[in-house]
Amino acid sequence: MTQVRLVKLKLKAGNEQIWLDWCEELKQRRSEVTETLRNEGVLSESCFLSEDEKCVYYFMEAESFERAKEAMEESTFKIDTEHREKRILSLEKSEQLSELFHFEVRS
């Protein structure tokens, strides 16, 4: 079974647009994103904007978060470096939400 994680991150006041622009850019660079996710063993990754636009919710599904973290830290992909920079500039950790359940149906 895969591992899942949902994290609530606060957008840094004054830097919200940096993250929103980055999210749009990621959609344009889909092939780079999928290449790095594959390298990390990440099966899916999603980001959602809260209704008040002060937070984002970040969902990840991976074979192993330990492996994903190691691969991310050792990554030489340009997009990973850019992602870290944008995250540092525009997001601050708020809380990791507790998983109550996760079901998978894959064929």
Residue ranges and their predicted role:
Residues 14-20, 66-70:
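Short, conserved charged micro-motifs
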Residues 32-43, 61-98:
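An amphipathic, aromatic/His-enriched active-site/gating alpha helix that lines ligand/cofactor pockets
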Residues 55-57:
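General beta-strand recognition
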Residues 4-10, 59:
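Active-site-flanking beta-strand signature of metal-NTP-handling nucleotidyl enzymes
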Residues 104:
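A conserved mid-domain beta-alpha-beta active-site/ligand-binding segment of alpha/beta enzyme cores
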Residues 44-53, 63:
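N-terminal secretory/targeting leader peptides
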Residues 17-41:
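Short amphipathic alpha-helical segments
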Residues 1-3, 50-51:
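Short, flexible turn/loop "capping" segments at secondary-structure junctions
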